[in-house]
Amino acid sequence: MLDFDLLKDCYGCGACVNVCPRGAVHMTQAADGSYIPEIDEARCIGCGRCDRVCIHQHADKNHTPLGKEGCYAAYQLDTQARKASASGGMFFPLAQEMLRQGGYVCGCVWNEQMDAVHIVSNKLEDVERMRSSKYVQSDIGNCLATVRGLLKAGKPVMFCGTPCQCAACAAVTGNPENLLLVALICEGAPTAGVWQRYRDAKAAQYGEKIRNVNFRSKTPVGWTMPYFVLTTESGKRHQEMSYRQNPYVLAMLQGLTYRQSCYHCEFKGDNGSAD
């Protein structure tokens, strides 16, 4: 059961957690802060479902050769709506259309503790929280099982995440026609532990909790000079130029804080699994 080097090769995608019939698999944080599965041997019945959906063990089955299919570039035409997003803003109109069709959206939000987590919702206010980049690996929780249940009930669902998370969603659900997979263009995900230590250090420095973060704010300059903005509980904003001054973003761009599987990712580039 998941008999390989988890710290080196696991993607922390949560597919195994979402298919275990006995709840014997849960995610824990490794020493580097990355999510890896831990199996409760007392509850495990050896059914092998975790191995069958493991995207690392079956990486060759989850690839969509983008180079052969071709692709299009697009961006949100509404200037104000685009400002609320980190890049071209295409997630939001796709999600809005899914809601108009009576469907659900699964995406990443900040929870009350300012941890990145995936949620499933058909409410516009939740979808608005999913906008903008979160430069940290999210906790997928039980979302994949929830998505599978909705798909089986005939509901259309849009799932948005990293390429490895999209592969996990496809593996758990069987990738039916009513599932729309939307992948980020990913260069690697900093571990949750790294973000949590940075967040807590800044909260201690400012003397109050962090309530919001924008890694690529288009205020005050715009697209060409994004700012890293932390907002504390009192509403005060603390900002630095993302690519020149902020140590968290700079460490990420230099590839210093990724989970280990990111350095030999089997799903990036043309090896994606999204629509």
Q: Which residues does each predicted region cover?
A:
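Short, intrinsically disordered, charge-biased short linear motifs at domain edges
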Residues: 1-7, 38-42, 245-253
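Short, charged low-complexity linear segments at domain edges
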Residues: 1, 15-37, 134-137, 229-247
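Iron-sulfur cluster-binding cysteine motifs and their immediate structural context
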Residues: 2-3, 9-11, 15-32, 36-38, ...
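Glycine-rich loop at the start of a catalytic domain that most often binds anionic cofactors/ligands
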Residues: 41, 47, 120-121
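Iron-sulfur-associated redox domains of electron-transfer enzymes in respiratory
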Residues: 58-275
